Amino acid sequence: MNQLEQKLEQDFGIVFSQKDLLETAFTHTSYANEHRLLNISHNERLEFLGDAALQLVISVYLYNRYPNKPEGEMSKMRSTIVREESLAGFTKACGFEQYIRLGKGEEKSGGRERATILGDLWEAFLGALYLDQGLPAVEKFLNQVMIPQVEKGNFDRVIDYKTALQERLQVNGKVDITYTVIDESGPAHAKEFTMQVAVDGKELSTGFGKSKKLAEQAAAKSALEQLGN
């Protein structure tokens, strides 16, 4: 964690006084499960707290920034900003993914690149930052990293990857596109779904998500990337 601490101080001016919070934020359940005898804490509870802090900061920002936008539009913007893929992108942009502690199995299966894990890490980090330094520190950090992207208009439009994939594949005629859940993991309150998208019965790609809808979108996005779109 020393390298992570140095990075946080150098890049963002953040110095944690409670080092254990930072370590917990970067510990995935798979790592904790593989080291049960050490009684290591994982980041799910911090993720819960960080999600609330993130929602509040973004909500206040949108309320103040767009005084004429109706509630419905602001809700859509917020949903786009805090969606799993967006948070995963910010995690990678900050270089946080290299510091997360994963179990061996999760590491081998590509967990370090999985949007669900990276999005959860982002929220857990915010939760740890909130407990260590309060909401102003969370707001300051988000103003450094997330808000500039909102100001650039990068979240004005929600991309429907399923529709985009359908339009891409049906250019030359109708095809049968199906989405199938091929795996479910995690406790009941924190399920992760693995979705397979197939075209005319042939597997095209897979995706992961905390809900079936999110997993479908992830699978469709992955398929578009494979098709070079």
UniProtKB/Swiss-Prot annotation:
Residues 160-229 form the DRBM domain. One of its GO terms (molecular function) is double-stranded RNA binding. InterPro entries: dsRBD_dom, RNase_III, RNase_III_dom, RNase_III_sf. Keywords: Cytoplasm, Endonuclease, Hydrolase, Magnesium, Metal-binding, mRNA processing, Nuclease, RNA-binding, rRNA processing, rRNA-binding, tRNA processing. CDD domains: DSRM_RNAse_III_family, RIBOc. Residues 5-134 form the RNase III domain. It catalyses: Endonucleolytic cleavage to 5'-phosphomonoester. It is an enzyme of class 3 (hydrolase). It is found in: Cytoplasm. The keyword Nuclease applies. HAMAP family: RNase_III. Homodimer. Digests double-stranded RNA. Involved in the processing of primary rRNA transcript to yield the immediate precursors to the large and small rRNAs (23S and 16S). Also processes some mRNAs, and tRNAs when they are encoded in the rRNA operon. CRISPR (clustered regularly interspaced short palindromic repeat) is an adaptive immune system that provides protection against mobile genetic elements (viruses, transposable elements and conjugative plasmids). CRISPR clusters contain spacers, sequences complementary to antecedent mobile elements, and target invading nucleic acids. CRISPR clusters are transcribed and processed into CRISPR RNA (crRNA). In this organism endogenous ribonuclease 3 and Cas9 are required for correct coprocessing of pre-crRNA and the trans-encoded small RNA (tracrRNA). This is Ribonuclease 3. It comes from Streptococcus thermophilus (strain ATCC BAA-491 / LMD-9).
